[in-house]
């Protein structure tokens, strides 16, 4: 599933062709995503001008000059394509601008979504209402995380995946950040001391920034809007590397935690 770096990369790619553009056409080729595409999406978007593109957690937000906010989630396999040569079966949504830029939302597994709300309702939108701070902002800091971990006996990896605690982190980057911080994913959260929490916060920010710089991580379906792959997957230290050697020489292990594959080096991570 695309996580924060993939959505951030997507928003940056879309911004290059959509920012300030007037929308002249919208086509819903197949409305059956995780939730049906809003039936009034054409009348609300056609003729409007895009004034901002941003990200919140794993969602992208495109706002027009009518204060309509188009919110997308890429699900398991979704991605945006810029000026595709032709449309495929799973190009669900197509938007065209006055300067002849065409973008399409492609999602073969249909776990993605498109929603449309008023800009002033974004903070109270059901999926944003209780979401945690962005990990790349100052609001996500060791003091904040310490308060969240203080009384929890849940495994630290499970806490990092809780979007109410911190926004946008998924399985890939939780595994990589915990490895960099040398913390075992199963450690009870309340057992981490402040130095370890500080190291973990640094590692989360560092891993996410590196991933964004590499355009995210391509495993199966993800690609940037311009068609380029995300190359951070070539820099993984543990994710997807069961049976391979860690940099320390120990064998990387995999086990299931909370229904998700978890990769670690039990020699490095304590």
UniProtKB/Swiss-Prot annotation:
Catalyzed chemical reaction(s): Hydrolysis of DNA containing ring-opened 7-methylguanine residues, releasing 2,6-diamino-4-hydroxy-5-(N-methyl)formamidopyrimidine; 2'-deoxyribonucleotide-(2'-deoxyribose 5'-phosphate)-2'-deoxyribonucleotide-DNA = a 3'-end 2'-deoxyribonucleotide-(2,3-dehydro-2,3-deoxyribose 5'-phosphate)-DNA + a 5'-end 5'-phospho-2'-deoxyribonucleoside-DNA + H(+)
EC number: 3.2.2.23, 4.2.99.18
Entry's Gene Ontology BP terms: base-excision repair
Positions with a binding annotation for DNA: 90, 109
SUPFAM superfamilies: Glucocorticoid receptor-like (DNA-binding domain), N-terminal domain of MutM-like DNA repair proteins, S13-like H2TH domain
Pfam families tied to this protein: Fapy_DNA_glyco, H2TH, zf-FPG_IleRS
Classification via SMART domains: Fapy_DNA_glyco (SM00898), H2TH (SM01232)
Cofactor binding summary note: Binds 1 zinc ion per subunit.
InterPro entries: DNA_glyclase/AP_lyase_DNA-bd (IPR015886), DNA_glyclase_Znf_dom_DNA_BS (IPR015887), Formamido-pyr_DNA_Glyclase (IPR020629), FPG_cat (IPR012319), MutM-like_N-ter (IPR035937), Ribosomal_uS13-like_H2TH (IPR010979), Znf_DNA_glyclase/AP_lyase (IPR000214), Znf_FPG/IleRS (IPR010663)
Active site: 2 (schiff-base intermediate with dna), 3 (proton donor), 58 (proton donor), 260 (proton donor)
Cofactor(s) in the UniProt record: Zn(2+)
Domain of life from the UniProt record: Bacteria
GO molecular function annotation: 8-oxo-7,8-dihydroguanine DNA N-glycosylase activity; class I DNA-(apurinic or apyrimidinic site) endonuclease activity; damaged DNA binding; zinc ion binding
Zinc finger (FPG-type): 237-270
Similarity section: Belongs to the FPG family.
Main function: Involved in base excision repair of DNA damaged by oxidation or by mutagenic agents. Acts as a DNA glycosylase that recognizes and removes damaged bases. Has a preference for oxidized purines, such as 7,8-dihydro-8-oxoguanine (8-oxoG). Has AP (apurinic/apyrimidinic) lyase activity and introduces nicks in the DNA strand. Cleaves the DNA backbone by beta-delta elimination to generate a single-strand break at the site of the removed base with both 3'- and 5'-phosphates.
Annotated protein name in UniProt: Formamidopyrimidine-DNA glycosylase
Upper classification of the organism: Bacteria, Pseudomonadati, Pseudomonadota, Alphaproteobacteria, Sphingomonadales
Gene name of the encoded protein: mutM
């Amino acid at each position: 599933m695309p996580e924060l770096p993939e959505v951030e990369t997507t928003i940056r790619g879309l911004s290059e062709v959509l920012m300030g553009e007037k929308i002249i056409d919208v086509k819903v080729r197949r409305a059956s995503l995780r939730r049906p595409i809003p039936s009034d999406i054409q009348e609300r978007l056609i003729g409007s001008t895009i004034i901002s593109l941003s990200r919140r957690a794993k969602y992208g937000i495109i706002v027009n000059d009518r204060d309509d906010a188009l919110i997308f989630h890429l699900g398991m396999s979704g991605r945006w394509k810029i000026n595709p040569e032709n449309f495929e079966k799973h190009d669900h949504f197509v938007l065209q601008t006055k300067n002849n830029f065409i973008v399409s939302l492609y999602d073969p597994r249909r776990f993605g979504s498109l929603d449309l709300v008023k800009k002033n309702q974004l903070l109270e939108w059901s999926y944003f209402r209780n979401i945690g701070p962005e990990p790349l902002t100052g609001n996500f800091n060791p003091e904040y995380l310490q308060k969240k971990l203080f009384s929890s006996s849940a495994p630290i990896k499970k806490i990092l995946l809780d979007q109410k605690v911190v926004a946008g982190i998924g399985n890939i980057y939780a595994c990589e950040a915990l490895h960099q911080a040398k913390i075992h994913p199963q450690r009870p959260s309340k057992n981490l001391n402040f130095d370890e929490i500080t190291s973990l916060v640094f590692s989360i920010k560092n891993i996410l920034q590196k991933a964004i710089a590499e355009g995210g991580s391509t495993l199966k379906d993800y690609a940037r809007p311009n068609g380029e792959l995300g190359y951070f997957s070539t820099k993984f230290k543990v994710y997807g590397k069961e049976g391979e050697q860690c940099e320390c020489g120990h064998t990387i292990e995999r086990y299931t935690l909370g229904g998700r594959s978890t990769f670690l080096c039990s020699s490095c991570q304590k």
